[in-house]
Amino acid sequence: MSRRSTNEGRLTRPNPVYRNRLVNMLVNIILKNGKKSVAYRILHEAMKTIQQKTKKNPLAVVRQAIRRVTPNVAVKARRRGGSTYQVPVEIKPDQGKALAVRWILAAARKRPGRSMAFKLSYELMDAARQTGNAIRKREETHRMAEANKAFAHYR
C-alpha cells in the first residue's frame, strides 16, 4: 500500500457577482496573462448577451451547456509491446467538468466574430442547444472510446 497521501484538491471560491463556483471556474480558465478583470468582463458581457438573446437565466444556460458538453469517458494513450493503444477510461465528474469548460472556450476562440464575449456567449448557447464545436468534440471523444473498447483491459 502506498504511503503517499492523496491530494485533497483546492476549494474554488464562488464568483462575487453570481455566487457560483462554476462561473469562477470559467473565469479562471478564460484568464490570460493574469488579467482577471479582463476575464471577468468577458464573462459578464457574455452572460448579458445570453440574457438578451434567450430571455432565460444566463446561469441556467451555462450550467446546461456544461452539463451537455461534459464527457463520461476519454481515451488515454498506453504503450504496450512497442505499439500505442488508445485506451478508454472513465472520467471523474470534476475532471469532466474541467474538460467541458476547456472545450467550450477552445471552440469559442476558434469561432469567427467580433469579441471574445460575443463568441463565448454564442458557443454557450449552442452547447445548451446541443450544437456547436464543443458538442462535436464530446461526441468525437465518445466515438473514439467506443471504437477502442476492445483495449479497455489495458488500463
Curated annotation (Swiss-Prot):
The UniProt entry, under Gene3D superfamilies, shows: Ribosomal protein S7 domain
List the CDD domains hit by this protein, alphabetically: uS7_Chloroplast
**Which regions span the lipid bilayer?**
none
The source's superkingdom equals Eukaryota
Record keywords: Chloroplast, Plastid, Ribonucleoprotein, Ribosomal protein, RNA-binding, rRNA-binding
The record ties this protein, via InterPro entries, to: Ribosomal_uS7, Ribosomal_uS7_bac/org-type, Ribosomal_uS7_CS, Ribosomal_uS7_dom, Ribosomal_uS7_dom_sf
What's a GO cellular component annotated to this UniProt protein? small ribosomal subunit
Q: Which Pfam families match?
A: Ribosomal_S7 (PF00177)
Gene Ontology BP terms: translation
Instruction: Describe its function.
Output: One of the primary rRNA binding proteins, it binds directly to 16S rRNA where it nucleates assembly of the head domain of the 30S subunit.
**Which HAMAP family would you find in this protein's record?**
Ribosomal_uS7_B
Please report which protein family the annotation says this sequence is part of: Belongs to the universal ribosomal protein uS7 family.
Query: What does the annotation say about its assembly with partners?
Result: Part of the 30S ribosomal subunit.
Name of the protein this chain belongs to: Small ribosomal subunit protein uS7c
Q: Which lineage is the organism of this entry classified under, starting from the top rank?
A: Eukaryota, Viridiplantae, Streptophyta, Zygnematophyceae, Zygnematophycidae
